[in-house]
Every structure is written in structure tokens, then in C-alpha cells.
């Protein structure tokens, strides 16, 4: 699928706006290109590559023009561009994803523990939303998006997207972290390793323990 060139600026705007409330530490130098050092001490972020060895490829990624494979259980694919793909994002407080959705495909309820998200729809029709905290009575904020529409998901809030159209959908999203993380709710609760006690989940979700065990068997294999 070819992404409409006229809507590319919206994706760029999403990235620029993600700078405003970046949650990662601000850099204290021009750049700090990430480098993996198994012999080093763990730090909150990444070690810096010697600036004299930094080159253009440390700030480059290619491939967001290519659709992701949505032939899976949820009918979506997230192509992530964070510090793991672009080491030069280290300390920059931003990252980017492309999300492809098959018709009726979804990005299931999940959270990003370390970053807010701003999403721009490029093709198709999405129903998107997030749920506020217990303190706010778990209110649902949701909208149907069309090409060019933008929606924000606050940091830590459970949110989702589902393709409600008859054609594939494409969205881009900027996140206010070099590695925002993702916690998919169903996989985390029912697919933890080792499993959470079924009796605990049965009472928490008001389900029969046998149903919980069935869900654990399903999500534990993903």
C-alpha cells in the first residue's frame, strides 16, 4: 500500500509535537549515540559511543514506507523505530512507530509506561481511545479517526486502536521517549511467566477459575 504523500506532513508534525513533553533526560552534549557494552555497568539509558566514531548511519533508519505483515491473531503490525533501531535517538526523548491494520484488525489494549503518544491516521478509518485512571472513574475517551486526524494517548493510560473500515489502515505515531515500552494488557495478565495464581485472577475478574486457566493457556503460548 502506498502512503498518500499529501498526508506525510501530518506524520512529521506528530514527531515534532512529541518533543514538547519528552520524559527522557535532556542531553548534555550534541549527541550520545547508544552502544551496547555487555561488560559495562547498567545505566538508566545507554552508554555513549565515542563521538569520533559516530557517523550518519547512527541517525538513520529505512523502511517505514513498507507495510507490516498483519497476518496474525490481532490483524495489526507495529514497526518500531526507537533507540534499538536508531542508536542516535539515545537521550533525545523521542521515537516513532508505523502501525498497519488489516480490515477489523486492532492494536489491543496496552500502555506505554515511559511515554505519551500522538497518532496521526494516514489511510483508512480507526476507532481509537484510552481509559483514564481509577481516580477519574475510568472514563473512556474515544473517537473515530479519518485520514489526517490526530489523537493523543497520555502516558501510562490503557489505550487501543481498531480498524472499523473495509480497507487496510495505516497510522504513524510519535512517542515522548527513546524507548516508551509497551505492556499489552491481556498478554501481561494472562500470559505472565510464571503464571499469576488462577484463583487470584478469577476473583479479580469475577470469572470461574477454569476460564482463567483457559485464558492463561491461550496467552501463555503467545
Swiss-Prot record:
Functional summary from the UniProt entry: May play a role in plant defense. Probably has no oxalate oxidase activity even if the active site is conserved.
Family: Belongs to the germin family.
Native source species: Arabidopsis thaliana
SMART domains recorded: Cupin_1
Superkingdom of the source species: Eukaryota
Protein name listed in UniProt: Germin-like protein subfamily 1 member 18
Keyword Metal-binding: yes
One Pfam family matching this protein: Cupin_1
Keywords: Apoplast, Disulfide bond, Glycoprotein, Manganese, Metal-binding, Secreted, Signal
InterPro entries according to UniProt: Cupin_1 (IPR006045), Germin (IPR001929), Germin_Mn-BS (IPR019780), RmlC-like_jellyroll (IPR014710), RmlC_Cupin_sf (IPR011051)
Binding sites annotated in the UniProt record for Mn(2+): 110, 112, 117, 159
Signal peptide: 1-22
Subunit structure: Oligomer (believed to be a pentamer but probably hexamer).
Glycosylation sites: 77
GO CC annotation terms, alphabetical: apoplast
Entry GO MF terms: manganese ion binding
Disulfide bonds: 32-48
Subcellular location: Secreted, Extracellular space, Apoplast
Amino acid at each position: 500500500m502506498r502512503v498518500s504523500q499529501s498526508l506525510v506532513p501530518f506524520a512529521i508534525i506528530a514527531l515534532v509535537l512529541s518533543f514538547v513533553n519528552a520524559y527522557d533526560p535532556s542531553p548534555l552534549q550534541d549527541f550520545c549515540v547508544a552502544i551496547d557494552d555487555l561488560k559495562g555497568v547498567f545505566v538508566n539509558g545507554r552508554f555513549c559511543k565515542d563521538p569520533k566514531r559516530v557517523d550518519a548511519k547512527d541517525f538513520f533508519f529505512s523502511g517505514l514506507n513498507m507495510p507490516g505483515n498483519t497476518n496474525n491473531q490481532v490483524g495489526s503490525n507495529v514497526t518500531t523505530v526507537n533507540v534499538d533501531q536508531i542508536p542516535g535517538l539515545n537521550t533525545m526523548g523521542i521515537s516513532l512507530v508505523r502501525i498497519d491494520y488489516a480490515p477489523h484488525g486492532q492494536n489491543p489494549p496496552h500502555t506505554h509506561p515511559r511515554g505519551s503518544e500522538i497518532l496521526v491516521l494516514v489511510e483508512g478509518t480507526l476507532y481509537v481511545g484510552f481509559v483514564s485512571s481509577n481516580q477519574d472513574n475510568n472514563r473512556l475517551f474515544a473517537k473515530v479517526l479519518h485520514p489526517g486526524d490526530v489523537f493523543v494517548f497520555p502516558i501510562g493510560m490503557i489505550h487501543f486502536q481498531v480498524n472499523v473500515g473495509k480497507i487496510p489502515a495505516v497510522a504513524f505515531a510519535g512517542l515522548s521517549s527513546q524507548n516508551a515500552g509497551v505492556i499489552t494488557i491481556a498478554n501481561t495478565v494472562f500470559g505472565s511467566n510464571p503464571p499469576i495464581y488462577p484463583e487470584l485472577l478469577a476473583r479479580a475478574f469475577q470469572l470461574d477459575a477454569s476460564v482463567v486457566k483457559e485464558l492463561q493457556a491461550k496467552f501463555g503460548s503467545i
